[in-house]
Design a protein with these regions (language model features):
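Bacterial N-terminal signal peptides that target proteins for export
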Residues: 2-11
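Short boundary/loop segments of OB/S1/cold-shock single-stranded nucleic-acid-binding domains
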Residues: 24-39
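Structural detector for short beta-strands of small beta-barrel domains
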Residues: 38-53
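Short aromatic-glycine-enriched beta-strand elements
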Residues: 51-62
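Short nucleic-acid-contacting surface segments enriched for D/E, G, S/T with interspersed K/R
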Residues: 83-99
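OB-fold/S1-family single-stranded nucleic acid-binding modules
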Residues: 104-127
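Extended, charge-rich, solvent-exposed interface segments
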Residues: 122-146
Length: 146
């Protein structure tokens, strides 16, 4: 085997390994979210971004003193949400929802949504998150938020 072929093969292995690690990190729940920090909150839908690789739900959550805090929730990819019965217009701006999930490790006002519930009807919409849930909600309850 020539040195040129050996170098090319070694380079290919290094590049593929790097891509694999980057891909794993991007899709790793544990890298971004803390499963020891469950949360449940209710707020008003302000925006839904129906994009790949994840759908994002933005909600204003009431705070003490009448103010609100904007939160962003990562959900599963559009095709998984569609399998669960979601459509682009499943939620409307101004609709009140309750969301269960896990807070981001960096402490920001972002979270991975596990379950979205319409407050008015009690209808549960699975969020198809990357935390290993079933499509219709959850195979097990989210631990109580502290």
């Amino acid at each position: 085997m020539s040195a040129k072929n050996t170098f090319a093969k070694a380079l290919a292995v290094v590049v593929l390994a790097g891509v694999s690690v980057a891909s794993y990190a991007h899709h790793s729940f544990a890298a971004q979210y803390d499963d020891k920090k469950p949360l449940k909150m209710t707020g008003t839908v302000t925006k839904v971004e129906w994009t790949n690789p994840h759908v994002y739900l933005f909600v204003d959550v009431p705070q003490k003193g009448g103010k609100t805090q904007a939160w962003g929730f990562e959900m599963g990819p559009p095709h998984m949400l569609q399998k669960a019965g979601w459509k682009k217009n499943s939620l409307t701006i101004g609709e009140e929802v309750s969301i269960e999930g896990w807070q981001a490790r960096d402490g920001s006002f972002t979270a991975n949504a596990r379950r979205v519930t319409r407050t008015a009807t009690g209808e549960v919409l699975g969020a198809a998150s990357s935390a290993g849930q079933t499509l219709t909600g959850s195979s097990q309850p989210v631990p109580a938020a502290k």
